[in-house]
Amino acid sequence: MLDPALLRQHPADLAERLRSTRSFDLNIAELELLESERKRIQVRTQELQSQRNSKSKAIGQAKAKGEDVAALMAEVAGFGDELKASEEALDAIRAKLEGIALGLPNLPAEDVPLGKDESENVEQSRWGTPRQFDFAVKDHVELGAPHGWLDGETAAKLSGARFTVLRGPVARLHRALAQFMLDLHVGEHGYEETNVPLLVNADSMRGTGQLPKFEDDLFQTEVGESRRYLIPTSEVPLTNIVRDEIIDAERLPLRMTAHSMCFRAEAGSGGRDTRGMIRQHQFEKVELVTACAPEDSDAEHQRMTRCAEVVLEQLGLPYRKVLLCTGDMGFSAIKTYDLEVWLPSQNTYREISSCSNCGDFQARRMQARWRNPVSGKPELLHTLNGSGTAVGRAMIAVMENYQNADGSIDVPQVLRPYMGGLERIG
């Protein structure tokens, strides 16, 4: 959530920044009307509260003197209903203003390029050279389906579209990738392994920015009066660990990682990526989350992105690093790097990791703070999140980049200890 002071004090400036960087139209007239009404009702509410307090004090003094307080009691009762109505109206106005604030995206950092969509993202670097094949390249479905290793038909029978059953050595490869990523991030990159719930409450979803804007893309469960959401990424529970907390400076930065299933309705994906495992309702990801002091978030962003790059480099997968433009950034981010891995079957790079600095945007929603040792006061943390990496897409990239003419797949050297020494699949 943006600083409420921006909404109250500089609505026109904020509206222009949102329009120019996010193509977001803020209704200033509605905002100013609500703010004016809030001020009016708040003044009247405070007047009534002051009168109540004054009369209550007078009643106490009169009782102490043994005087008749019936008239004073009647007077208090006379404006009690108005005070209650005024307080309720004030709460309603505040709720509307908060609803507007919760729907506003974060403001991009100054060094983020302006752009309308992914076509205006800016490539930063490339690593590795895409392999030149001397045979017709197969995609991951053609490599896995004939052996029953990758089975979309059975998954469709069980659950519908955008699900996949994995079997045999490909299922083991998928598991090996997740274990390798966790071991790397914990053992070499200093993240703390964390096992998180897959079901979270609405407060958690609001904290990281999924609610209220993206509710249509979330899977929900209801049991009685209890509603929970299946996580779209373990960013949600990991980041919310610091919700309503004040973290001592000595504990910062907090670096956490989790391997989890993720669930997305893909409400806006239409007919994109319907073949294979590129875009699924259920998938697995190794997530990286950091909470730190504001002055450290830029360096932590670079560090986190580098940690994700190391995964791809150790797997020997060519990739490129892209700085997202304002029109392609996520709702909560101030700056985002995407890592895109080379897929031979598509002859292009596809996103496999997205690493974002969210500044104090999520922390303000969560009231996640740290105690500044200089001032001694609680201040908002900065939060960051990144994929380290998507497991299914990493598996696809390994299958396609390491394929042989006979349809077999070489196992990357770094994964062989996790595969019982297996050097080739098929």
From Swiss-Prot:
CDD domains: SerRS_core. Pathway: Aminoacyl-tRNA biosynthesis; selenocysteinyl-tRNA(Sec) biosynthesis; L-seryl-tRNA(Sec) from L-serine and tRNA(Sec): step 1/1. Gene3D superfamilies: Bira Bifunctional Protein, Domain 2, Serine-tRNA synthetase, tRNA binding domain. Keywords: Aminoacyl-tRNA synthetase, ATP-binding, Cytoplasm, Ligase, Nucleotide-binding, Protein biosynthesis. Its main location: cytoplasm. Belongs to the class-II aminoacyl-tRNA synthetase family. Type-1 seryl-tRNA synthetase subfamily. This is Serine--tRNA ligase. It comes from Xanthomonas euvesicatoria pv. vesicatoria (strain 85-10) (Xanthomonas campestris pv. vesicatoria). The gene is serS.
